[in-house]
Swiss-Prot record:
SUPFAM superfamilies reported in the protein's UniProt record: F-box domain
InterPro entries (UniProt xref): F-box-assoc_dom_typ3, F-box-assoc_interact_dom, F-box-like_dom_sf, F-box_dom
PROSITE patterns per the UniProt record, alphabetical: FBOX
Protein name: Putative F-box protein At4g38870
Domain F-box, first and last residues per copy: 47-92
Organism: Arabidopsis thaliana (Mouse-ear cress)
């Protein structure tokens, strides 16, 4: 049985809340951490509508709810609030949330407004053909103010959390709760910074990685990684820790993907920093490794997830709608396998049509192994996303309702297909 990690204050509140349901002989005048489990086994029941429910059963019920009622249930009692805010329960809720259908998140950066627009789309499961009508999807749009656009970068959603901002004020944002936290400032001076966010499924920890690049010495404006700092979210000492391990010389690129506790990001290596490579960061052990890529690896490809593995997707022949996939089979030995797929007719015609020529593949659906094509700009005529099942040669799409009627002077900085409800309180 899992012992809840309550603080002393929470334990006192829990005792007062639960003591009403304890048998008279079981009530104790003292409450210490060592007796927490014993006391919990003795009562493990709270009164809900005159019914007695074990605490473990309450947790099993609560974790299956959506986030909105859980937020309301914080006001039910101090005991319920302690349960919902407990890290162990938050991990249970996240694991349950990962089993549900994922949402699609667009993050747009509007330079004129100095803001970030994030829209959450509920995917349509209706398969369509090129002659059938599209189905619509509901969405929620958030407007997040960002006071500066200087060197601002945006990391894709990782289990519901988004990291964005300039080096001076990096922000972790939870679209579900609409809460954010500003991380401690990184002193980088005029040097550029790449930030990434990863998740360790074993410990349930989120970690933010910041890599400070040196001043570029070459015409390609790429600088070597000089300093690497890591911050663990949700800890009492939320400060940056310097990584002193020797890492392979590389210049990081702001494109990353976290799969099963390993954060992958693109990089350039070589004396001229013009050779493509992929770096891996084990979120739990905080170890870096260099992954060799195929000799004909294309620099304009996209990191993706395919059948639970890291993959690199690219156009083999764009005019004919041929998609190529490099799939990482063995990271330690740099072994890759290659697959090619012909896009279904609807997707192939969409990528070449005039009205949808701004669409490009942005991500893959980890649950269905589908490639997702999304618009690069926010406009009512470009408000659809196309899902291509390469294995089954099928296509489905949805149309987002309520998109802006005018062009926004912005690009889609990131598109994530794995958005889930996250109970983490920032």
């Amino acid at each position: 049985m899992k012992t809840l990690g309550f603080s002393p204050k929470q334990k006192f509140c829990a005792r007062r809340q639960t003591q009403r349901w304890l048998p008279e002989g079981d009530r104790s005048s003292s409450f210490t951490p060592s007796t927490m489990e014993t006391q919990r086994k003795k009562f493990t029941k709270v009164s809900v509508n005159s019914e007695l429910l074990p605490v473990d059963l309450i947790m099993e019920i609560l974790k299956k709810l959506s986030l909105k009622p859980l937020i309301r249930f914080l006001c039910v009692s101090k005991l319920w609030a302690s349960i919902i805010r407990d890290p162990y329960f938050m991990k249970l809720f996240l694991n349950e949330s990962l089993k549900r259908p994922k949402s699609l998140v667009f993050v747009f950066r509007a330079q004129s407004l100095g803001s970030i627009f994030s829209s959450v789309h509920l995917k349509s499961t209706r398969e369509i053909s090129s002659s059938s009508s599209s189905s619509s999807a509901s969405s929620i749009t958030y407007h997040v103010t960002c006071y500066t656009q200087q060197r601002m970068t945006i990391s894709p959603s990782v289990h519901g959390l988004i990291c964005y901002g300039p080096p001076s004020s990096l922000v972790i944002y939870n679209p579900c709760t609409r809460r954010s936290i500003t991380l401690p400032k990184i002193k980088a001076g005029r040097r550029a910074i790449n930030q990434y966010i990863g998740y360790d499924p074993l410990d349930g920890n989120y970690k933010v990685v910041c890599i400070t690049r040196g001043m570029p010495m070459l015409r390609n404006r790429r600088g070597l990684a000089e300093e690497i700092q890591v911050l663990t979210l949700g800890t009492r000492d939320s400060s940056w820790r310097m990584i002193h391990d020797i890492i392979p010389p590389h210049s990081p690129v702001s494109e990353e993907l976290c799969i099963n506790g390993v954060l992958y990001y693109r990089a350039f290596i070589g004396t001229k920093l013009n050779e493509s490579a992929i770096m891996s960061f084990d979120v739990r052990s905080e170890k870096f490794d260099l992954i060799k890529v195929p000799c004909n690896f294309r620099s304009f490809s996209k990191l993706a997830k395919y059948e639970g593995k890291l993959a690199v997707i690219f156009y083999e022949k764009k005019t004919s709608g041929i998609i190529g996939l490099w799939i990482l089979e063995d990271a330690s030995n740099g072994e890759w396998s290659k697959k090619t797929f012909a896009l279904p007719n609807l997707a192939a015609s969409s990528t070449n049509s005039r009205i949808l020529k701004l669409q490009k593949f942005r991500t893959t659906d980890a649950d269905t192994c589908e490639i997702i094509f999304t618009p690069s700009y926010a406009h009512s005529s470009l408000s659809s996303a196309i899902y291509c099942d390469l294995k089954e040669n099928k296509v489905r799409k949805f149309v987002k309702e309520g998109w802006t009627e005018n062009y926004l002077p912005c690009n889609a900085d990131s598109v994530s297909s794995t958005q889930v409800e996250n109970l983490m309180f920032l």
